[in-house]
Amino acid sequence: MIGIDIVSIARIEKCVKRFKMKFLERFLSPSEIVLCKDKSSSIAGFFALKEACSKALQVGIGKELSFLDIKISKSPKNAPLITLSKEKMDYFNIQSLSASISHDAGFAIAVVVVSSSNE
């Protein structure tokens, strides 16, 4: 399954300026906030990545999957890594998750590919 999302970096920047940490804490863990280093483009990329993951799982963000259920980290080469708790991995029958984020022309775009044990 594949999920994709695109976000305006300016829109995220406006939300960060208006709501500050309250906005970030709604969808990012403390370690993810540190990884973003207060960069609007990184914050937008992480937001898009979590939305793309929810779309790949065909549930959206809501009761079955929250923003904070989705964990983002970085590889030694700075590539995004995405995971869910073991409970959510089992619930959605996920074998692996792959992710990519890109930024251009004021937008952040993210793609998530989910491989399930059923495939």
From Swiss-Prot:
Amino acids binding Mg(2+): 5, 51
Transmembrane segments: none
MF terms in GO: holo-[acyl-carrier-protein] synthase activity; magnesium ion binding
Cellular component GO terms, alphabetical: cytoplasm
Major site of localization recorded for this protein: cytoplasm
Keywords: Cytoplasm, Fatty acid biosynthesis, Fatty acid metabolism, Lipid biosynthesis, Lipid metabolism, Magnesium, Metal-binding, Transferase
Catalytic activity: apo-[ACP] + CoA = holo-[ACP] + adenosine 3',5'-bisphosphate + H(+)
Localisation per UniProt entry: Cytoplasm
EC number of the protein: 2.7.8.7
HAMAP family from the UniProt entry: AcpS
The name this protein goes by in its record: Holo-[acyl-carrier-protein] synthase
